[in-house]
Amino acid sequence: MRLRNLEHNENAKKKEIIVYCSENWNCSNNALRKLFFRSSFHLRGPLAWLALSLSRKIKIFHSFSSIANRNLPIDRAGLLTKQLTMLKFSNEEVCKGQSFLASCEIKSRFVCLHVRDSAYLTTTMGQQRKKHDYRDSEIKTYVAAAESLAEMGYTVFRMGAIVKEPLVSDNPRIIDYAANGMRTELLDIFLGAHCTFTISTGSGWDSVPTVFRRPIMFVNQLPVYAPSVTTLQSVTFPKILLDNQTGSILSLKNLIDREIAHRANSQAYKDAGVEIRDLSSEELVEAVTEMAQRVEGTFVETPEQKEMQAKLKHILSTHQKLQPSPNYYPIRAQFASCFLSRYPNFLHGLD
């Protein structure tokens, strides 16, 4: 929805009004829905269906389009980097958010950590969603990374509406917001909108820091190539994919040849003979350290890393099995330099 508004603002030659129509406005977060309603004009129920019917028939309406089947927001035009967010918190909401931060004795920098597991879909959908298992991680592997960020002076909020296990750490700068009773729907949005940066494994909540233009790093991210991620100005350290017969780490060329580089289904990886390995605690520490340095402006890439970044961007921008045409989905994301240094064979076999 946010991208639809930005596309409109970018292309509009005369004053127009966008009207969103829906049978219902079920939403996973009511605080976010309030922000949307505050910034856009919406109709719902029978009135919405009447408006939709009229928009198809009467020429006074400039255009009609459906966003019902737009499952993934892909920012081809780079509008998220060109324009400021249209969502605004009320004074009351800002006061509540600031009071919460003050109660946690947070005066400056904090990071949101969101680690996907099976609990949310199992609880909300009423069944185990095996299709998405490949995206899950174990929160215990992130403890060392969170503690590393805390040592750098950041407070770390573990995010999530429904989580499988607690984040266990004695460090007072690490707050298991998702499991300790602090969580509210407003704070879900406020924290994502005001964090110094976000570390996430890829989920619906990522839209919050994205919409509010907060820096984001995706760790344990799959698929390796996803236009909804690679068109963002983000940093990625993907899960490690191996041949399930030989145990050898698969290169990007291997993934493309097996038609698995872009697949978003657990069964697809099994059918392709691919084993998925989550990042180790050590790798996660490297990843978040690099992200903190990038945000702080202290990160320095080696000449070899710069060369690998350029090569990878060229491949992702032009490969005919990844792009309908060259640069159709502009590559604005970078892969973590520590990933490229650890796995230089990832780029072997491709020019």
Task: Name each region found by the language model.
Residues S108-K130:
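Conserved donor-binding/catalytic core segment of Leloir-type glycosyltransferases
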Residues L32-L101, L121-Q127:
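Catalytic core of nucleotide-activated saccharide and alditol-phosphate transferases
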Residues S65-Q98, S103, L232-D351:
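Leloir-type glycosyltransferase catalytic cores
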Residues D188-S234:
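A donor-sugar binding/catalytic signature common to diverse glycosyltransferases
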Residues M1-S66, A161-V163, Y177, G181-M182, ...:
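Active-site and donor-binding regions of nucleotide-sugar-utilizing enzymes
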Residues L113-L121, I139-T184, P303-L312:
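Catalytic donor nucleotide-activated moiety binding site of glycosyltransferases and closely related
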Residues F37-S39, G153, H194-C195, F212:
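Short, well-ordered alpha-helix to beta-strand connector turns
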Residues N24-N26, R116-Y120, I162-E165, G204-D206, ...:
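Short, solvent-exposed loop/turn segments at secondary-structure junctions
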